[in-house]
Curated annotation (Swiss-Prot):
Name of the molecule in the record: Fluoride-specific ion channel FluC
Task of the protein: Fluoride-specific ion channel. Important for reducing fluoride concentration in the cell, thus reducing its toxicity.
InterPro entries per UniProt: FluC
Gene Ontology terms, MF aspect: fluoride channel activity; metal ion binding
Topology versus the membrane: Multi-pass membrane protein
Predominant localisation class: membrane
Length: 128
């Protein structure tokens, strides 16, 4: 039950952060069809989870409870694959196949690159 509460706490914080960041990105972005708020949240989430994975790779650096709070709760509540899927479907239904394809490819490629970068940054920092 304790870990469920940790997930709920992390999820609440992550969801509130997602809502806030998405609103800021929407307010300051150009009016175009690319779903920039969700894209921004998801790539930042990839960077953060990469950094957390780098920290977790050090034995005992992140406790199992903290891992549940951060990975499952915080980052899980922050990123949003379901919104990514829905926005892609809307783009496809509106006939915006090129934008949908760019969104899919850039989300995956940029997300993976930032995950790797986050992991490597933490690894380099911890070696110094």
């Amino acid at each position: 039950m304790y870990q469920v509460m940790l997930v709920a706490l992390g999820g609440a914080i992550g969801s509130a952060a997602r809502f806030t960041l998405s609103g800021l990105v929407l307010r300051y972005s150009l009016d175009w069809r690319f779903p920039l708020p969700t894209f921004t949240v998801n790539i930042i989430g990839c960077l953060v989870i990469g950094m957390l994975a780098g920290l977790a790779s050090k034995e005992g650096f992140i406790s199992p409870d903290m891992r549940v709070l951060l990975f499952t709760g915080l980052v899980g509540g922050f990123t949003t694959f379901s919104a990514f899927g829905l926005e892609t479907l809307v783009l496809l239904r509106e006939g915006l196949v090129g934008i949908a394809a760019a969104y899919i490819v850039s989300s995956i490629v940029v997300g993976l690159v930032l995950m790797w970068l986050g992991f490597e940054l933490v690894k380099m920092t911890m070696q110094a």
